[in-house]
Amino acid sequence: MYKDIKVDPAQLEAALDARLKIRAGFDKPTAGMAAGMTQVNMISVPRDWAYDFLLYAHRNPQSCPVLDVLEEGIYATKLAADSDIRTDFPRYRIWKDGEMVDEVTDAREIYNAHPDLVTFLIGCSFSFETALQEAGIEVRHIHDDTNVPMYLSNIKCEPAGRISGNMVVSMRPIPSHQISEAVKITARMPSVHGAPVHIGHPESLGIKDVNKPDFGDASRIEAGEIPVFWACGVTPQAAVINSKIPFAISHAPGYMFITDIPDRAWMG
């Protein structure tokens, strides 16, 4: 749970401006937007599947840290004022029987056609990137204005009911001398994925080519840098695919919802 701390009015304004910009049609990855404000992933599943998913998230908290749950017919989250999860992500993916069938920028009609959906908002590693930058650690995909690279790993998540799947991981190249600091910073923020799950040796995670991510864009890895992998909130989408959930709506990887909660509120 986040700490109730005073929020800079300028940060709140930046977060609201970002949501309004997205609502008006902004369609790019959100890393670096409203810097210092928490971003979240999303998955909506039918009520009949909601308990299974809640249990799945509970059993896999590093990859699926639940920050809010919205009951059917509820589209505003306590994490942000003047919010609508049907319009405030830049892109949505529509899933049927484990297959992605569409990608849209406004999901209101789809939610209206499926009123039984329960929505889970999941912590996102974008929320520790400002802390990394403040420590002098470059976040490559922000620097290069690309999407973070994400990979389906060979790490099996703990199954729950009808839901199972493997962990998706995100990667950031970190200079070898800064890795210990990156671990210390992110370990303090378990609600947004916490410490890395793996350092170096992508092949150990079943990643054949680190330059060919399953989601997002490849990141440059310079001499002296090591690929560092964190659990990722795209893991629920891997579960949707593997479990062939009859219907689901998710965000598009890297296209997040921006909240009114400062990143530092999650620091332990």
From Swiss-Prot:
Q: Name one GO molecular function term.
A: lyase activity
Q: What's the EC number here?
A: 4.2.1.-
Tell me the keywords, alphabetical order. Answer: Lyase
What domain of life? Bacteria
* InterPro entries per the UniProt record, alphabetical: D-Glu_cyclase, Putative_hydro-lyase, UPF0317
The record's listing under PANTHER family reads: D-GLUTAMATE CYCLASE, MITOCHONDRIAL
Q: Which family does it belong to?
A: Belongs to the D-glutamate cyclase family.
This one is known as: Putative hydro-lyase ABSDF2257
**Organism in which the protein naturally occurs:** Acinetobacter baumannii (strain SDF)
Q: Taxonomy-wise, where does this protein's organism fall, top ranks first? A: Bacteria, Pseudomonadati, Pseudomonadota, Gammaproteobacteria, Moraxellales
